[in-house]
C-alpha cells in the first residue's frame, strides 16, 4: 500500500510504497502506482523520477503510453493509490547539481537595490546594469540537502532572523550537455517544477566579512530551504514556459505576482551560461530566479506560524507551514 508520494503530474508523480519512493502517474482524478503499472513494461526496475531522467526520451514515451492505457480503464484496481495516505516528496531526489539564478528579474533587482543591498554608488550601478553585452547570468549552487516537499514545514534555524521567500520556476535536465547553445537548450530540458528559494538574508549578506560580504551557502542551503514540487511536469505539457504566472502568499497576503517572461536572462540563456562552466547531466535542477515582492524589500520576514503558498501556473501549488527549529 502506498504511504508517501513525490511528484510527477500527468505523466507522473512519485510515491513511496512500503516506505520506498517509486514513480507514480497522476491522471487528475486518480493516482496510480507506477510500480504496479510498470512491472511488466519497458520501465521495469526504474524506482524514481531521477532514474527516469537518465534515459528520458524513451521513458517519457513509455509513460505516455502507460497513462493512456490506464486512462482508458485498462489498469486494474490494485494500482490505485489512496490519496489520503500519501505525502509529497521533492519530485527529484538527490540531484547531481542544484543551480539557482540570482538577480534575474528587473523588479527584484530594483527592490533589492532600494533595500540597501548595494553599499556604494558603483555597486548600485553594477546591479542595475543588465546590458547583456557586458553582463553574464549570475548562477550559484544550493545544497541538495535543502530539498523538501511541497507540503513540508519550512524550518527557521535559531541562527537567523531574516528568512525570506522567493517563488521560482525550476527546470530539470533530461540530457547531458556541455556548451549548449541557447537556441537548442530546451531540447535538453525534461520538465518543470514549482519551487521556493527560501533565503536567510542575514547570512546571505555577511556584515562580519565586509570584504567578501556575500555568503550563498549560508544564505541559501539550510535544511528545508528548497521546497520543490508537488509535480514534475514534462516539457511537452507546458505550451510556453515564458508565459507562466508566479505567485506567492504569506498567511493569505499576496507578496509576489509575476510572469516568467520578465526574466532578464531566459531559461535558455541560463542553460547556455551554466553549460559553458560545467557539464549538465540528467536530473540536474536549474531554478531561474524570482520576481519582485520578496520580504527583504520591506523588512518583512517569515516567522513561526506563517503559512507560505507558492505556485507556478500549471505546475502545482505548495503550502508550507513555517516553524521554528527545535534545538535540544
Give the label of every model feature segment.
Residues 3-7, 16-42, 226, 292-328:
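Charged, cofactor-coupling segments
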Residues 230, 254-281:
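Glycine-rich active-site loops that engage anionic ligands at enzyme catalytic sites
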Residues 150-153, 263-271, 288-293:
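Short, structured beta-strand/loop micro-motifs enriched in basic residues and often containing a Trp
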Residues 3-7, 15, 22, 44-250, ...:
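Active-site microenvironments in enzyme catalytic cores
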Residues 143, 149-150, 280-297, 310-313:
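Conserved metal-binding segment of the jelly-roll/cupin
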Residues 157-159, 274, 296:
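Short, solvent-exposed loop/turn positions at domain surfaces
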Residues 10:
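Cationic, low-complexity basic patches in intrinsically disordered or flexible, solvent-exposed regions
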Residues 93, 100, 281, 303-304:
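Residue-level recognition of short, solvent-exposed, well-ordered loop/turn junctions
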Amino acid at each position: 500500500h502506498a504511504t508517501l508520494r513525490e511528484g510527477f503530474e500527468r505523466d507522473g508523480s512519485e510515491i513511496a510504497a512500503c516506505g520506498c519512493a517509486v514513480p507514480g502517474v497522476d491522471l487528475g482524478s486518480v493516482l496510480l502506482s507506477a510500480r504496479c503499472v510498470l512491472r511488466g513494461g519497458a520501465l521495469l526496475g526504474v524506482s524514481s523520477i531521477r532514474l527516469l531522467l537518465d534515459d528520458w526520451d524513451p521513458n517519457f514515451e513509455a509513460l505516455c503510453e502507460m497513462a493512456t492505457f490506464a486512462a482508458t480503464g485498462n489498469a486494474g484496481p490494485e494500482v490505485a493509490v489512496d490519496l489520503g495516505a500519501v505525502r509529497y516528496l521533492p519530485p527529484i531526489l538527490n540531484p547531481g547539481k542544484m543551480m539557482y539564478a540570482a538577480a534575474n528579474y528587473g523588479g527584484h533587482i530594483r527592490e533589492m537595490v532600494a533595500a540597501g543591498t548595494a553599499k556604494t554608488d558603483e555597486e548600485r550601478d553594477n546591479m542595475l546594469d543588465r546590458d547583456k553585452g557586458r553582463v553574464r547570468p549570475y548562477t550559484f549552487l544550493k545544497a541538495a540537502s535543502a530539498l523538501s516537499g511541497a507540503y513540508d514545514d519550512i524550518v527557521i534555524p535559531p541562527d537567523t532572523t531574516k528568512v525570506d521567500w522567493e517563488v521560482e520556476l525550476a527546470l530539470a535536465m533530461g540530457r547531458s550537455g556541455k556548451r549548449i547553445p541557447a537556441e537548442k537548450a530546451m531540447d535538453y530540458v525534461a520538465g518543470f517544477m514549482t519551487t521556493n528559494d527560501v533565503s536567510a538574508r542575514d547570512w546571505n549578506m555577511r556584515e562580519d566579512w565586509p570584504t567578501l560580504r556575500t555568503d550563498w551557502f549560508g544564505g541559501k542551503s539550510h535544511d528545508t530551504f528548497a521546497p520543490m514540487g508537488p509535480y514534475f511536469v514534462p516539457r511537452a505539457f507546458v505550451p510556453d514556459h515564458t508565459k507562466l504566472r508566479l505567485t506567492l502568499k504569506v498567511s493569505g497576503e499576496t507578496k509576489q505576482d509575476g510572469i516568467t517572461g520578465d526574466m532578464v536572462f531566459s531559461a535558455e540563456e541560463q542553460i547556455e551560461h551554466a553549460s559553458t562552466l560545467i557539464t549538465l547531466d540528467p536530473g540536474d535542477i536549474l531554478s531561474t530566479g524570482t520576481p519582485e515582492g520578496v520580504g527583504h524589500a520591506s523588512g518583512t520576514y517569515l516567522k513561526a506560524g506563517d503559512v507560505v503558498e507558492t505556485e507556478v501556473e500549471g505546475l502545482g501549488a505548495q503550502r508550507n507551514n513555517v516553524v521554528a527549529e527545535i534545538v535540544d
